[in-house]
């Protein structure tokens, strides 16, 4: 269990979590409904939640730039737009369930979302709204993980929760390739960076290290958002021995 009361979290989830591999739908009704239910449970537990959502279910910037005749900058910008599409879907679904929320965009899209402002976003969280942050870091060559870490620092969250669909934490090597890969319950920021481990962008880890924000990486196929906040699941990246948040 956690040592301290968690009051504010940044939940980073991939766009892939919204899609169903068995369907051609980019956004699965079942997956979206599950996400809404998870957010409602956590909000009802008096935890303030900001969400950073990826766009990989619609388009991946780097892979698209390699496969199509599109330069990297344009491809990354297209990927950022994909996160806005997912954010709009999430915002509307939350509204349908009477969950107050604020949809924000790092880049100006006034007809679609409010321009992200740290103070306004923090105020919205304090008012019980789910804050949805789209467009990543707002610049090419920077991942959505890095954008999530930036938002986590600005909003002064207690923990950054990164949900994945393929692994249940940080391993010493890729568990999908090596059956004997070992999962860490806890690893320090510096050890994560010095060992060149994957699963989360090192730039994001560096930002969280500077701000002293722990990161919990967990499997969204195995665990709920509530479990990631209140129980010991996945891997904690922090400076605290033992992985306590």
UniProtKB/Swiss-Prot annotation:
Enzyme class: transferase
Pathway noted in the entry: Pyrimidine metabolism; CTP biosynthesis via de novo pathway; UDP from UMP (UMPK route): step 1/1
Activity regulation info: Inhibited by UTP.
Main localisation: cytoplasm
Residues involved in UMP binding: 55, 76, 137-144
Record localization: Cytoplasm
Swiss-Prot/TrEMBL GO biological process terms: 'de novo' CTP biosynthetic process; UDP biosynthetic process
Record-given protein name: Uridylate kinase
Organism: Chlamydia muridarum (strain MoPn / Nigg)
